[in-house]
Amino acid sequence: MRVMAPRALLLLLSGGLALTETWACSHSMRYFDTAVSRPGRGEPRFISVGYVDDTQFVRFDSDAASPRGEPRAPWVEQEGPEYWDRETQKYKRQAQADRVSLRNLRGYYNQSEDGSHTLQRMSGCDLGPDGRLLRGYDQSAYDGKDYIALNEDLRSWTAADTAAQITQRKLEAARAAEQLRAYLEGTCVEWLRRYLENGKETLQRAEPPKTHVTHHPLSDHEATLRCWALGFYPAEITLTWQRDGEDQTQDTELVETRPAGDGTFQKWAAVVVPSGQEQRYTCHMQHEGLQEPLTLSWEPSSQPTIPIMGIVAGLAVLVVLAVLGAVVTAMMCRRKSSGGKGGSCSQAACSNSAQGSDESLITCKA
């Protein structure tokens, strides 16, 4: 049995690793399902993605030409055809179950058949450093709002409203929590251990962040200091700003950790400071890939800062030079045209412009 859920709220076989296996930190496996109804355009679309830690390893899309579970990581591609056939059938059963649930939910909320609605689920397990279940999850959301969730005890449910209480009574009558608990404590943990072993070069690596602090003047009186962490894995990281040793949490702008597109992550934290007091502020960073926490501060550049008015003046000069260049080119064209070579100058100008553009693009790509 498999289960899943949202942020606003998807494996039978033994893992082959002993319970004595240990890791430096905890690990997780999550399945995220989304079913979206689309009245007048066929059956609801169902998409499921699976993650081990921060790495996607499987995907299913009911709208695919040939819907099947698709590997998204090299270490799961080694699973045989029986595995993929079995997983595909589970996805298809889950898709059908979600279609029924969408119809039921529309009735619970007394909604018409005309609108589109969304059902999301997340399920999975966390594995502790001792190789045992740390926590299990099964949560659902409807139209972007929390609906029902399995509690941490893995024995009871929390319903968000009276409609969800209908579902809760059905789940309790079916003793669904017991089945989920067996899955989370057994199958989920066993497969997570297996994936961690098969993909250990990727999943159990720790890449430290590349760090620096940038300075962005806002006015004569204030500036923004931004502390950057780039190219790190896993995604869990802590960034904080301090002023004279005191946390500036309330005054810090902190973005969500973002994927970099190459399997690593990036994040930054920013704080607005009075000009001239930058050295009183320090950025503090903690990550699994660091031997010890880092403390960073802004290092003023040895190059002079160009004031805004200077930049504007420089741009104005460039514009004037560009205009003068165009005038000179036009005059040269007229002279050549008077000598019976009218088209060649225009063609040459286009050719030179194109070559310059190509070189620029090549440089950017490199």
Swiss-Prot record:
Consequence of changing residue 90 to N: In allele C*07:01, C*15:02
Subcellular locations according to the entry: Cell membrane; Endoplasmic reticulum membrane
Effect of substituting residue 114 to A: In allele C*01:02, allele C*02:02, allele C*03:02, allele C*03:04, allele C*05:01, allele C*08:01, allele C*12:02, allele C*14:02, allele C*15:02, allele C*16:01 and allele C*17:01
A GO MF label: peptide antigen binding
Result of changing residue 176 to E: In allele C*01:02, allele C*02:02, allele C*03:02, allele C*03:04, allele C*04:01, allele C*05:01, allele C*06:02, allele C*12:02, allele C*14:02, allele C*15:02, allele C*17:01 and allele C*18:01
Position of the signal peptide: 1-24
Mutagenesis / variant outcome for changing residue 194 to G: In allele C*17:01
PTM per Swiss-Prot/TrEMBL: N-linked glycosylation at Asn-110 is required for efficient interaction with CANX and CALR chaperones and appropriate HLA-C-B2M folded conformers prior to peptide loading.
Effect of residue 327 to M: In allele C*04:01
Region (Alpha-2): 115-206
A GO term from the CC aspect: Golgi membrane
Family annotation (InterPro entries): Ig-like_dom, Ig-like_dom_sf, Ig-like_fold, Ig_C1-set, MHC_class-I_related, MHC_I-like_Ag-recog, MHC_I-like_Ag-recog_sf, MHC_I/II-like_Ag-recog
Phenotype when changing residue 138 to N: In allele C*04:01, allele C*05:01, allele C*08:01, allele C*17:01 and allele C*18:01
Main subcellular location: membrane
Superkingdom classification of source: Eukaryota
Effect of residue 297 to R: In allele C*01:02, allele C*02:02, allele C*03:02, allele C*03:04, allele C*04:01, allele C*05:01, allele C*06:02, allele C*08:01, allele C*12:02, allele C*14:02, allele C*15:02, allele C*16:01, allele C*17:01 and allele C*18:01
Intervals, Cytoplasmic compartment: 334-366
Effect on the protein upon substituting residue 217 to L: In allele C*16:01
This protein's UniProt keywords: Adaptive immunity, Cell membrane, Disulfide bond, Endoplasmic reticulum, Glycoprotein, Host-virus interaction, Immunity, Innate immunity, Membrane, MHC I, Phosphoprotein, Signal, Transmembrane, Transmembrane helix
Effect of residue 121 to W: In allele C*01:02, allele C*06:02, allele C*14:02 and allele C*16:01
Quaternary structure (record): Heterotrimer that consists of an alpha chain HLA-C, a beta chain B2M and a peptide (peptide-HLA-C-B2M). Early in biogenesis, HLA-C-B2M dimer interacts with the components of the peptide-loading complex composed of TAPBP, TAP1-TAP2, TAPBPL, PDIA3/ERP57 and CALR. Interacts with TAP1-TAP2 transporter via TAPBP; this interaction is obligatory for the loading of peptide epitopes delivered to the endoplasmic reticulum (ER) by TAP1-TAP2 transporter. (Microbial infection) Interacts with HTLV-1 p12I accessory protein.
Function description: Antigen-presenting major histocompatibility complex class I (MHCI) molecule with an important role in reproduction and antiviral immunity. In complex with B2M/beta 2 microglobulin displays a restricted repertoire of self and viral peptides and acts as a dominant ligand for inhibitory and activating killer immunoglobulin receptors (KIRs) expressed on NK cells. In an allogeneic setting, such as during pregnancy, mediates interaction of extravillous trophoblasts with KIR on uterine NK cells and regulate trophoblast invasion necessary for placentation and overall fetal growth. ALLELE C*01:02: The peptide-bound form interacts with KIR2DL2 and KIR2DL3 inhibitory receptors on NK cells. The low affinity peptides compete with the high affinity peptides impeding KIR-mediated inhibition and favoring lysis of infected cells. Presents to CD8-positive T cells a CMV epitope derived from UL83/pp65 (RCPEMISVL), an immediate-early antigen necessary for initiating viral replication.
Protein name per the record: HLA class I histocompatibility antigen, C alpha chain
